[in-house]
Amino acid sequence: VTDATPTAGPEEAVRVLRDDHERLLTVVGQCATAVTAEWDGDSVTDRERVVPPFRRALDGSGALSRLPRALADAVTATGRPMAAPPVAAPPYVVVTGEGVVLRANLGDGRLVVLLRAFEVDRGGDGDGDSDGDGGDGGDSEPHRYRRIDGVEIEAEIV
C-alpha cells in the first residue's frame, strides 16, 4: 500500500471542463459569437478586432472571473498539486486570437488548456515551415481569424 496520489493525464482535465463547466463553456462560445457579429464577413485579419472585444465580452458576461475556478478543477482532476491559486489574469488566464489559454504550474510540469473559439489561418505559402518570425517572407498573407463551431478543448501537460 502506498500513500502516493495517482495522477491522471490531461484528458481528465478536459473531461472535468466538459462535464462540470458546460455552462461556462457555452458562455465562452456566446462571447466569441458576439465578437463575430461586429465583423463585416465571416473572418477578419485584424487581431485587435478579436482579442480586445473577446476579452471585454468574457469580462462583461462574468465568464472571465469564473475561468480560474474551472482551471483549478481541471488541475484537481489530474491529481497534481497546483503551485498557486489561479487568478483571472496572465499567466493563468490569457485571451488570445484562438480563444482562452488556461495555465497552471504543477509539481511536475504545467497544465496548458486551450478553449479554442477561433481558428487562425496564418497565411503564407502553406508549406507549414514558417516559424512565425518573419524570416524572408516580407509580403506574407496576414493572419485571418474565423469563428469555429462551438468551443474545442485542448489540454496538455508540459
Language-model features: locations:
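Acidic, polar-rich N-terminal leader regions of halophilic archaeal proteins
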Residues: 1-158
